[in-house]
Amino acid sequence: MSQGMLTILSAENHNHASSMLANTLIDLISQNNGETTIGLAGGSTPSLAYSILGQETDLLANVIFWLTDERWVHHDDDLSNSKMIKSSFDKNDISLLYPDFSGDNATLDAEKYTERVLSSFTEFTCAVLGVGEDGHTASLFPGSNALDEKGVKFVSTNVEAHPRIRLTATFELLAQIKNVYLLVTGNNKKDIVEEIVKGETNLPVNHLINIRTETHLLTDQL
């Protein structure tokens, strides 16, 4: 498979990378005529960028946020990405689409979330993604059943992390997003950043880069 274009934005440290990402999103929203849709990753890495972005209250009025992946828990659970994201935006009343938690059928919950997202908008402006030390992005982990899913936008998957059951966007969905930003910071991510830049291994993050025309990497490890 041919390698997609990787645009690297080097930062001095995590705070600098977070500020760069937030300002990039602010510029994108400002330049976008009409509604903007932004996919958000969970975890602690992007929380500062979200907090900076959350200060732009008026600008966010025309933004619909959605989740690139979610732990299969209630959206108010302390483990949920939804709760972390809302907290990061410092009580700014953002429009965030999150999946319902049935508690008994993750596959059906993923299907319903697909319907919720696609009925709300049809154009995916951009998304923020993290990358794990094992090369996973969203909840597309190495060896996961979700890696080979075709014809669907979100699926449920079992992963080697807690909680095990996740809902995740598929490669098919992530490939059609106009702008994808990988935020990868910290000394523990140095090795995986090198793997991303080399592009020689078929880790989930490298596969994503290869199926896209262009992907942006913001990191303090280069």
For each feature predicted by the language model, list its residue ranges.
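N-terminal glycine-/serine-/threonine-rich phosphate-binding loop
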Residues: 1-38
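Ligand-binding beta-strand-loop-alpha-helix segment within the catalytic cores
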Residues: 2-5, 60-128
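Glycine-rich N-terminal segment of FAD-binding domains in flavoprotein oxidoreductases
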Residues: 27, 34-54
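Glycine-rich beta-strand-to-loop/alpha-helix junction loops that act as flexible
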Residues: 40-45, 129-133, 185
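A glycine- and small-aliphatic-rich helix-loop capping segment at beta-alpha/alpha-beta transitions
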Residues: 52-60, 86, 142-150
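Short, conserved loop/helix-junction motifs that constitute active-site signature segments
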Residues: 56-64, 146, 172-178, 208-212
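Class I SAM-dependent methyltransferase SAM-binding "motif I" and its flanking Rossmann-like core
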Residues: 126-129, 133-172
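ATP/nucleoside-binding phosphotransfer catalytic cores, i.e., glycine-rich phosphate-binding loops
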Residues: 178-222
